[in-house]
């Protein structure tokens, strides 16, 4: 099982679109997806594909958006769809965002639904419990 998880790790950010890059890491049986750039109408499809294509195991995961510069309603929609899939599969997940991203998520009252945490360590602790 560990061998499969090691295959998930991507050292460098992968170019998903002109404005979005993605990365995968493994932290104590929790997958951490890290994104940087813009999560918007132009990148939401690639975001969803990147996450779903790399969920080969039934391990909980964190979507780290602390390096996202811009999040629009399409990006929020992609996060909501991901959360709905996780809830259906009973798969643990959490979202971490910088102050701008967190404010956007809280503004539309999705913080609890998306298991929004203030930092990566809080998200990892949440998923270990």
Label each region the model flagged:
Residues 1-13:
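N-terminal leader/presequence segments that are low-structure
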Residues 4-5, 23, 70:
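Intrinsically disordered, low-complexity regulatory regions of eukaryotic regulatory proteins
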Residues 11-49:
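STAS-typified acidic loop motif
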Residues 41-114:
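Amphipathic alpha-helical interaction surfaces in cytosolic regulatory modules
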Residues 115-122:
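Short acidic-hydrophobic, aromatic-tinged amphipathic segments that line or gate anion-handling sites
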Residues 127-129:
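A short, charged, amphipathic alpha-helix used as a generic interaction element across diverse proteins
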């Amino acid at each position: 099982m560990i061998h499969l998880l090691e295959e998930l790790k991507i050292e460098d950010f992968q170019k998903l679109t002109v404005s979005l890059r993605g990365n995968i890491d493994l932290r104590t049986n929790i997958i951490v997806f890290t994104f940087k750039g813009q999560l918007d109408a132009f990148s939401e499809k690639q975001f969803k594909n990147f996450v779903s294509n790399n969920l080969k195991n039934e391990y909980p995961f964190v979507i780290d958006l602390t390096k996202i510069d811009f999040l629009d309603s399409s990006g929020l929609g992609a996060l909501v769809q991901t959360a709905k899939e996780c809830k259906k599969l009973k798969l643990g997940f959490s979202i971490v965002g910088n102050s701008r991203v967190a404010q956007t998520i809280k503004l539309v009252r999705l913080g609890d639904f998306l298991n929004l945490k203030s930092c990566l360590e809080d998200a990892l602790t949440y998923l270990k419990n």
